[in-house]
Amino acid sequence: MTQELSVTRFDRRQFLALTGAALSVAPFHALASHVVGSEQRATDGYGPLQPVRDDTTGLLLLHLPAGFRYLSFGWTGDPLSDGSLTPGSHDGMAAFSTSGSRIRLVRNHELRRGTAFAARPMYDANGGGGTTTIEFDTVTGSVVDVWASLAGTAVNCAGGPTPWNSWLTCEETVAGPGGDNDYHHPHGYIFEVPVDGTASAKPIRSMGRFVHEAVAVDPATGIVYETEDQAASGFFRFLPDETSNLAAGGRLEMLALTDKPQADTRTGQTTNVWHPVGWVPIDDPDPDEIAADSLYSQGIEAGGATFARLEGAWYGDGRIYVVSTNGGEAQMGQVWEYDPTGERVRLIFESPGIDVLDMPDNICVSPRGGLLLCEDGQSNCFVRGLTVDGTIFPFVRNNIVLAGEKNGFEGDFRTREFAGATFSPDGRWLFLNAQSPGITFAVTGPWSDGPL
């Protein structure tokens, strides 16, 4: 594990500004006794939530604090700029600077088998997933352009932005040709989508074939941290041979707790306790014979640590934050903080029950240094804020009930997950997705009145 890397040092502030992450407020690692522990604290955040009408449709789709407004766009079935239709199952997403008042969003579509929704760029004609890219004007609050940027992939769940202005989209499956599948090619990879165009549609095999969820890139080193969404999962990192050129290859490793080899972190954990970590090699990141736990098993045999369903991941001010969707004694979720400089990890939050936090999934770091947690739980779904002083509060509530008013959708979608939370680089807009029926929202309001 001593192989040298060719590293380009990216400016941390440029990357934080690029993706709308925290710049001015003390991050979680500035906390000491204030980290949420046995006393789980909840506050009003921006105040009580109330139903708010969508600026686009006039429907009461979201509950928000007073003073906030939103608009919807990019519904499943809406036309793309070329006349084809927007695919569904909106999931992970990130916002990027372009020029002037315009930003671009790269958005995942977590679809499985089926005809690819675009002919180019396409990996597998029978892969239903991929990404679309949206150009949005932050002054006018309107969509300028939208196009398919990757097609023919499968189960594109989350991913993450890079400091070199691209989106890494992750396949949450290891399915391939044969059996019950009609895929032409193997799946379970990471693909790179440039913000200024379309993807090459070539998987980055050295980053591993497993049940991927999300990634977070450390701009100081170019190392890519990867989460795995399995009941027993590992936390991986990819050390590229050439920073910003991931396709050139690299090596994959899995986190281990050096004070407890083969540790199981799913339960029995204490908040605010640092654990020293090391990394064990994954010798075969793309095995010929694949099972969902093939790479995890390699890591465990070498002493790696087990987590419960690692999903969302995001970089913020020198730290990597990841969530375990059903970790903890209540199986309602954990939030972990990894310190790459100190090579240590700690639990900073564990949900005591469904009313506090119900199975977090996608996450992002807010402009003021907190975390936004998108729920994918068992009840009415929320987006919740977790602040730097260790408090949690509801910020968005799903109120989507439709009777055919838009694109023919009917049904009660209030228990369906939120995903893709990401702030505009100027911090004025929060973008997020309702996975079903497939809607993207842009939320704005008096951010300075509260902790996000």
Placement of each model-derived feature along the sequence:
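Loop/turn-rich, solvent-exposed surfaces of beta-rich toroidal or solenoidal domains
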Residues: 324-325, 354-391
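Signature of short aromatic-glycine-proline-rich micro-motifs recurring in repeat-based ectodomains
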Residues: 85-94, 300-312, 359-362, 408-425
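Beta-propeller domains
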Residues: 272-346
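Conserved blade-ending motifs and adjacent loop-strand segments that build the rim/top face
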Residues: 349-361, 391-422
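N-terminal export leaders
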Residues: 10-28
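C-terminal segment of N-terminal export signals and the immediately downstream linker at the start
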Residues: 9, 29-64
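Blade-level signature of beta-propeller repeat domains, shared across WD40, Kelch, NHL, RCC1
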Residues: 417, 422-452
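N-terminal secretory signal peptides
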Residues: 1-10
